[in-house]
Amino acid sequence: MATAREIPLDRTRNIGIMAHIDAGKTTTTERVLYYTGVSHKMGEVHEGSAVMDWMEQEQERGITITSAATTCYWLGMDQQYPKHRINIIDTPGHVDFTIEVERSLRVLDGAVAVFCSVGGVEPQSETVWRQANRYHVPRLGFVNKMDRAGANFLRVVNQVKDRLNANPIPIQLPIGAEEDFKGVIDLIREKAIYWNEADRGRTYELADIPEDMKVEVQKWREKMIEAAAESSEELMDKYLEAGDLSPEQIRQGLRQRTLANEIVPILCGSAFKNKGVQALLDAVIDYLPSPTDVPAIRGEEDDGSEGSRSASDDEPFAALAFKIASDPFVGTLTFFRVYSGILKSGDSVYNPIKGKKERIGRLLQMHSNSREEIKEVRAGDIAAAVGLKTVTTGDTICNQQNIITLEKMDFPEPVISVAIEPKTKADQEKMGVALGKLAQEDPSFRVHTDEESAQTIIEGMGELHLEIIVDRMRREFNVEANVGKPRVAYRETIRRSVEQQGKYIRQTGGRGQYGDVWLRIEPREPGAGFEFENAIVGGVVPREYIPAVEKGVREQMENGIRAGYPVVDVKVTIFEGSYHDVDSSEMAFKIAGSMAFKEGASKADPVLLEPIMKVEVVTPEEYMGDVVGDLNRRRGMIQGMDESPAGKIVDVEVPLAEMFGYATDLRSLSQGRATYTMEFLKYAEAPSNIAEAIIKQQS
């Protein structure tokens, strides 16, 4: 039996704070750390000193890039709870870093979505929300910046409903707004809460609800109680009988429905003005899940069967590495979430994906940028290990006697690449090491050498993503590099099916080469990927040569059909062929497969695909005409227009090739007042004139 835990599992919360880039997420996280007693001097983002944003660049750019994990403790606003541990995983809000968000959502149990009371639900919020839906993460909403001009709580609540298709249930209402924002109404306790400005909101007073708000409070309180009552027949009966529920019953009902992803409780405040954050922490404990409230994580056992691990110290150890970071003091830090069992520093763990055993050096618990060495971690904990060499993001580490591979993470394919070369000979060797380390940290960033030009090519999710990589090489590894023009990651595919023979025969003195195959090459749905099927009957091509044929096809697909870009979304079936007892070899069949694909694909109506980006531009009305005209010139397809307090919103799909340097152009079109976000949407067929120009350029 495991020894006793410091804090029981049901009093642990693993949460993320997710938000659009300017909703005030870092400030909210800061205040959480301040009130939980971790951080004594509040960091302010606009002074560039926030505790969570620990990489220099983030401090300069004022945006959060790396998801650091922080542990803090909370006893409740009125010290009403036993001690709870809250692990916060900081998630970035910038669209070039959705991979980081994905990675952190994978290991969270619940999340707080921060919305700006003025900007409301912005495009990035939608992206992150969709990702959270995919992982079934229960959420709370916090409408922040209630003190800002244009703040409107109920408008944001409606946007959560309309734009995110969620079911928001306010459990607070703001008292006043903009500079008159004074505090909040707690709908459960039916009290007004005013935080004390003299001690930065550490203390507060409860008061009666202002007269002029009573009618509205009654209306929203009824909606909240109905939402709670719908959690069970028992509560519904009590509500119908008494016309009310006790605060305990309301919390119980809301918790049940939040955990089932049926509702999103909404709170409000101003993190910057120190209002509302402690109540938000109480809500994290009241409504978000502990590790024991979420289903057991599934995975593949060593024998290939499906297995699972539930949150218990008594189960075998299993954890998922979700972040690798280089640390100037201790070297490589591997952040991981423990799903089951106990791990002590000095123990050995097994990495089933790499098939390697490794010893854990030190275990650290991170309090944003300070760290505490700990002796052990248990189910539900989030910590960092020092000394793991082969583990990369998304790998499982587990007990070698009970091997399991936990669900892997899916990482998107890069859409943009640039050639990069070291400025000096001295930078040459360092650059290889630096890029290798950065690629280990970030699976959406790739490095390869172009065989023809021998240039080093780096690929990523957007211009900002690659800029930051180059910047980090300079700062962390002291490598100066020249960066080429960004290149688009085009793809090729086919539009019709063909059957094609590939026959490779070489007779020279002695043993010859003989491989003969017939392939059926067919288009697949966009995004469906590559499929290879063996339909050989009667052994006309022996089974041992089939993998070689597939390898030949795959290699040829990398070389493209007309323009040299990788081929995607095709199905290749080998259905006929012949072999020679003496002369056939894997090599011969690989070449035959490659020949058949090359010839067949070129007859299958090949087309060039280009990445299309989903772009959202927010512009003051007076620049609308210029902005739309410019987007049309960039081959943009306008999808819709909307209003927001920040200006007109234009939703548009634009080929990535037309978007280079857009930030600068948009600034000059709108005198710096318009903003945009962009994320990868899909690959689509390039118009023939564009495709021809690209093919010509490639040849």
UniProtKB/Swiss-Prot annotation:
It holds the Pfam family EFG_C. The keyword Chloroplast does not apply. The keyword Cell membrane does not apply. Residues 10-292 form the tr-type G domain. It comes from the Bacteria. One of its GO terms (biological process) is ribosome disassembly. Keywords: Cytoplasm, Elongation factor, GTP-binding, Nucleotide-binding, Protein biosynthesis. GO terms for cellular component: cytoplasm. InterPro entries: EFG_II (IPR041095), EFG_III (IPR009022), EFG_III/V (IPR035647), EFG_IV (IPR047872), EFG_V (IPR035649), EFG_V-like (IPR000640), EFTu-like_2 (IPR004161), G_TR_CS (IPR031157). Catalyzes the GTP-dependent ribosomal translocation step during translation elongation. During this step, the ribosome changes from the pre-translocational (PRE) to the post-translocational (POST) state as the newly formed A-site-bound peptidyl-tRNA and P-site-bound deacylated tRNA move to the P and E sites, respectively. Catalyzes the coordinated movement of the two tRNA molecules, the mRNA and conformational changes in the ribosome. This is Elongation factor G. It comes from Coxiella burnetii (strain Dugway 5J108-111).
